[in-house]
UniProtKB/Swiss-Prot annotation:
It comes from Pinus koraiensis (Korean pine). One of its GO terms (cellular component) is chloroplast. Protein S19 forms a complex with S13 that binds strongly to the 16S ribosomal RNA. Keywords: Chloroplast, Plastid, Ribonucleoprotein, Ribosomal protein, RNA-binding, rRNA-binding. GO terms for biological process: ribosomal small subunit assembly; translation. This is Small ribosomal subunit protein uS19c. It comes from the Eukaryota. It holds the Pfam family Ribosomal_S19. HAMAP family: Ribosomal_uS19. Disulfide bonds: none annotated. One of its GO terms (molecular function) is rRNA binding. The lineage of its organism: Eukaryota, Viridiplantae, Streptophyta, Embryophyta, Tracheophyta. PROSITE patterns: RIBOSOMAL_S19 (PS00323). Belongs to the universal ribosomal protein uS19 family. It is found in: Plastid, Chloroplast.
Length: 92
């Protein structure tokens, strides 16, 4: 179920504070965060945000098409290694 339109999108306060400070200084630094649930807002466009996937931080460059999506959508947590293959040689 979608979030109510009466409510504002969730963005972690520490992340929003860092974005605003970088926008004021007009700097582009990598911002490290564990907040996968934060929604991408227009103030984040052009910044690189390193999102934690459970093992490492994956750098994500935010574009205008990513607005209103969550940061966690762009940092996959599972690594698919393929299905187990049938090992017919070892059965003989």
């Amino acid at each position: 179920m979608a979030r109510s339109l009466k409510k504002n999108p969730f963005v972690a306060n520490h992340l929003l504070r860092k974005i605003k400070n970088l926008n004021i200084k007009k700097e582009k630094k990598i911002i490290v965060t564990w907040s996968r649930a934060s929604v991408i807002v227009p103030a984040m466009i052009g910044h690189t945000i390193a999102v934690h996937n459970g093992r490492e931080h994956l750098p994500i460059y935010v574009t205008d098409r990513m607005v209103d999506h969550k940061l966690g959508e762009f940092a996959p947590t599972l690594l698919f290694q393929g299905h187990a293959r049938n090992d017919k040689k070892s059965r003989r």
